[in-house]
Amino acid sequence: MESLKEPVATVSAQIDRTHYRTLIKTDNHSFISDEPVTIGGADTGPSPQELLLASLGSCTAITLRMYIDRKMWIVESIKVNVELFEIEGATLIERQLSFEGELSDEQKKRLVQIADACPIHKMLTGKIVIETGLT
């Protein structure tokens, strides 16, 4: 896919001999990802699955906040809960939204639609191509 040479985001993940603690670096941040103790990790950071859900949850919350602010609706807080399930060989992600503020039922229905417009939602539900190579 030669036309996709300008990255939107770049992340590196590096792991040494410590099971399964992984150093994640972005342009401006670094943090740890790990696996739970039950599968051999030390639980020193979120698991890869939790990071994926965090991406969807934070993107959803940010998208909703931008929309709510543009509409000048009175909303004190937005909470997005995201859960991952594996059912019969398929992956299911459930996302629940809750709002603290003055919203009508119609506004809440609109916000459910807006949640589906967040870039990470679109990415996860759209066509994804992953190319793996060596450096």
Please provide the spans of the model-predicted regions:
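Alpha-helical metal-binding/catalytic segments enriched in His/Glu/Asp
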Residues: 56-60
